[in-house]
Design a protein with these regions (language model features):
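Conserved "HGTGT" condensation-loop signature of ketosynthase/thiolase-family condensing enzymes
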Residues: 1-108, 112-155, 175-178, 194, ...
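Short conserved active-site loop signatures built around small residues
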Residues: 166
Length: 209
């Protein structure tokens, strides 16, 4: 089989330097740093007090408030980046739905959601855990929600390979296109693990400075 040439036609990002590619690139060129004091929880009892937090991202730019409440933050960040990449590519998702696949990784998935719902269960009883807990927490939900949101009907999967996940997803997407399985792939990675349990765990394994 002849190998297809693979090109990148659209870019999208939500990260500590900016909530889109233009702002991120401008900040990087200006030498700005996305690392700063953690603001999402009290770090007074933690050795590590710094992280790269996404600031000012409005999930309602991609989903309505009701739907956003049913999704973990990593999924919302992935949707924001995917929306920009799809728009940047100029592809017609409705016309090309059968030809577009999704490979989006997450190493931990909805870790803050797991913490929140565990605390809720401990305080109010486990029967009070949200019915959306499982679909919010599982790592493949970013890829799934992108496919659902944009009506994409090609392959949809999530490699869970820790810090290499995003690169893994891009590599897998490259092979899917090159080898003729799908003409188009939406690919990348999303993470949101700046939480007491996440920072505590990475600190204990001495992976943070």
């Amino acid at each position: 089989m002849e190998k297809r040439r693979v090109v990148i036609t659209g870019l999208g990002t939500v990260n500590p330097l900016g909530n889109n590619t233009a702002d991120s690139w401008a900040a990087a060129r200006a030498g700005k740093c996305g690392i700063g004091p953690i603001t999402q929880f009290d770090t007074s009892e933690f050795k590590c007090k710094l992280a790269g937090e996404v600031k000012g991202f409005d999930p309602e730019t991609v989903v309505d408030k009701k739907e956003a409440r049913k999704m973990a933050r990593f999924t919302l960040l992935a949707l924001g980046a995917a929306a920009e990449a799809i728009q940047d590519s100029g592809i017609d998702c409705e016309a090309e739905a059968e030809n577009i696949g999704v490979i989006v990784s997450s190493g931990i998935g909805g870790l803050p959601t797991i913490e929140e719902q565990h605390s809720r269960g401990e305080e109010k009883g486990m029967e009070k855990v949200s019915p959306y807990f499982v679909p919010m927490a599982i790592a493949n939900m970013a890829a799934a929600q992108i496919a659902i949101r944009f009506g994409l009907k090609g392959m949809c999967t999530c490699p869970v390979t820790a810090c290499a996940g995003g690169t893994n997803a891009v590599g897998d997407a490259f092979h899917r296109i090159r080898d003729g399985y799908e003409p188009v792939m939406v690919c990348g990675g999303a993470e949101s693990c700046i939480s007491p349990l996440g920072i505590g765990g990475f600190t204990s394994m001495k992976a943070l400075s």
